[in-house]
């Protein structure tokens, strides 16, 4: 296909147009008084959202050059979302500001490479300043609640629920967000290890009202193959009957004949037993069985280690304070495994999370880590309509990511104040030449933009508020929700330092690439062939 090439100002102006179109659509959502954006969907009701990255991902422009500009800023939002989970609108606003002022300087004759070097120097200084302003969150639930509330657009209910979930599952725990059946938003915490396999036969049920099997202080047998013949298990089963304790069997599967024998023995009352299939598949199954074994102090009986089911001894069995099995899930509470072995296993999984490049693998490893270390909480998001539920779910996701980021790197004053407090760090900074110094000035001006946009969205004059906040110190800032100037940290208006840092780093990175662009290549639009002439109009040549 033929290509069309544009150079210099022609190229950059068209790219800038695309940047502005996308950024203007995204930045209306910034701050507590930011507006919603409605997105058309091919099927079903339109989506209403206040999430910057969701808006950005929907935008495709007709002009290929403008679209490339929009895609660059979309990349800023996506990368910020991937790394920090929030701050996508802030990153977009910063990118637009750096590109806008930078482009004017390039047009006036500044060297783009020197500008980029100056921008990078300034960003490093601002990042240092953000780190110095940061306050550790630790286990301060009030601060966690504030972060969640701000990211959920000031929704106190969501803030409280996330703080409650965090308190229960701790730092390593996993919190997932799901749609509720009703209109209430609730949190449900699963203590201990839960995996998505239920009993193989309903005849194992001990509580017929709840249709659950509940065992106190049971033994747990873990086998990685199919149990075909029950005689292999007889020595263990006989000892179970003598001890009076229950047995949970976790195996790849159980043959119908062996299962029938187990059920008959269970119904006659002599044997307290329940069988479930092993969770996961392939290598992940092996890893999960090993996790269960370490948690319960047992051993995985596997032929890979030269073990056979008939050779199983009592000391190979794990145990736990309580086991609950329903038709879908098995939950093991307070496994009696060795604490040091569990810690060592947690360390191994953390190391794997660090090294893996696959998002899917990372998610599964995180789940395994949570099951061993903290537990799993599920936030069920409810709302009167599906449209509202999806919008609320977006906000809960943002709040959750922001809270995790705050626990990692602490919090800084919110409302764009952290950026303004970094300006003094840039005052004495000079570049190696005039253009580098101009790059530093560009960043100094751009980091005022998030506060200016928050104020504009609240219907006030941005320049006036920015000047007043700059005159203050520390966490003094403008609370757009209440329309007062106050200490934002005390008022609970705080942002995660990680989100604030990553938003600026990503914005500056893409803006630097943009300013140093000299040529843009796009597919040439092919002219559609003219439709054939109607043969009945042949005698009309003399008409004017």
Curated annotation (Swiss-Prot):
InterPro entries cross-referenced by the UniProt entry: Chaperonin_Cpn60_CS, Cpn60/GroEL, Cpn60/GroEL/TCP-1, GroEL-like_apical_dom_sf, GROEL-like_equatorial_sf, TCP-1-like_intermed_sf
Taxonomy, superkingdom: Bacteria
Keyword Nucleotide-binding: yes
Location relative to the cell: Cytoplasm
One GO biological process term: protein refolding
Top EC class of this enzyme: isomerase
Keyword Iron in record: no
SUPFAM superfamilies, sorted: GroEL apical domain-like, GroEL equatorial domain-like, GroEL-intermediate domain like
Pfam family, one: Cpn60_TCP1
UniProt-listed Enzyme Commission number(s): 5.6.1.7
Main location as per UniProt: cytoplasm
Keywords assigned: ATP-binding, Chaperone, Cytoplasm, Isomerase, Nucleotide-binding
GO cellular component terms attached to this protein's record: cytoplasm
Subunit structure: Forms a cylinder of 14 subunits composed of two heptameric rings stacked back-to-back. Interacts with the co-chaperonin GroES.
Function noted in UniProt: Together with its co-chaperonin GroES, plays an essential role in assisting protein folding. The GroEL-GroES system forms a nano-cage that allows encapsulation of the non-native substrate proteins and provides a physical environment optimized to promote and accelerate protein folding.
Protein name: Chaperonin GroEL
Organism field: Tannerella forsythia
């Amino acid at each position: 296909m033929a290509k069309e090439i544009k150079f210099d100002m022609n190229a950059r102006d068209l790219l800038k147009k695309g940047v502005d179109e996308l950024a203007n659509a995204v930045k209306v959502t910034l701050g507590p008084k930011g507006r919603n954006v409605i997105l058309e969907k091919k099927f079903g009701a339109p989506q209403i959202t206040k999430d910057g990255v969701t808006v950005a991902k929907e935008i495709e422009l007709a002009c290929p050059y403008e679209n490339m500009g929009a895609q660059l800023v979309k990349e800023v939002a996506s990368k910020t979302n991937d790394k920090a989970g929030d701050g996508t609108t802030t990153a977009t606003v910063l990118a637009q500001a750096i590109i806008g002022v930078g482009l004017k300087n390039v047009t006036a004759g500044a060297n783009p490479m020197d500008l980029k070097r100056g921008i990078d120097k300034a960003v490093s200084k601002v990042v240092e300043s953000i780190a110095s302003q940061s306050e550790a969150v630790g286990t301060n639930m009030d601060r966690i609640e504030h972060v969640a509330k701000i990211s959920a657009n000031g929704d106190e209910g969501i803030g409280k629920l996330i703080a409650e979930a965090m308190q229960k599952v701790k730092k390593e725990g996993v919190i997932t967000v799901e749609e509720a059946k009703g209109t209430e938003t609730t949190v449900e915490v699963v203590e201990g290890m839960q995996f998505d396999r239920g009993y193989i036969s309903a005849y194992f049920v001990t509580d017929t009202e709840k249709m659950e099997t509940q065992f106190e202080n049971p033994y747990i047998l873990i086998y990685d193959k199919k149990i075909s013949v029950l005689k292999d298990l007889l020595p263990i089963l006989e000892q179970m009957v003598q001890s009076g304790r229950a047995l949970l069997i976790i195996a790849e599967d159980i043959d119908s004949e062996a299962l029938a024998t187990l059920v008959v023995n269970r119904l006659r009352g002599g044997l307290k037993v329940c069988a479930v299939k092993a969770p996961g598949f392939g290598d992940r199954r092996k890893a999960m069985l090993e996790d269960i074994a370490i948690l319960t102090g047992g051993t995985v009986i596997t032929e890979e280690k030269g073990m056979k089911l008939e050779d199983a001894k009592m000391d190979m069995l794990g145990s736990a304070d309580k086991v609950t099995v329903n038709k879908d899930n098995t939950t093991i509470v307070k496994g009696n495994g060795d604490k040091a072995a569990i810690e060592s296993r947690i360390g191994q999984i953390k190391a794997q999370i660090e090294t893996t490049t696959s998002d899917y693998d990372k998610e599964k490893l995180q789940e395994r880590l949570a099951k061993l270390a903290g537990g799993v909480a599920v936030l069920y998001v409810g709302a009167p309509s599906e449209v509202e539920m999806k919008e609320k779910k977006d906000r809960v996701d943002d709040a959750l990511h922001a809270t995790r980021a705050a626990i990692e790197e602490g919090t800084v004053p919110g409302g764009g104040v952290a950026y303004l407090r970094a300006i003094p760090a840039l005052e004495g900074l000079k570049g190696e030449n005039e253009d580098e110094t101009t790059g530093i000035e560009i960043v100094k001006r751009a980091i005022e933009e998030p506060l200016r946009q928050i104020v504009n969205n609240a219907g006030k004059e941005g320049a006036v508020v920015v000047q007043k906040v700059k005159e203050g110190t520390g966490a003094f800032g403008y609370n757009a929700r209440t329309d007062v100037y106050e200490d934002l940290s005390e008022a609970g208006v705080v942002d995660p330092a990680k989100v604030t840092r990553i938003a600026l780093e990503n914005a500056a990175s893409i803006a630097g690439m943009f300013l140093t662009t000299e040529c843009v290549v796009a597919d040439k639009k092919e002219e559609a062939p003219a439709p054939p002439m109607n043969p009945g109009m042949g005698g009309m040549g003399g008409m004017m």
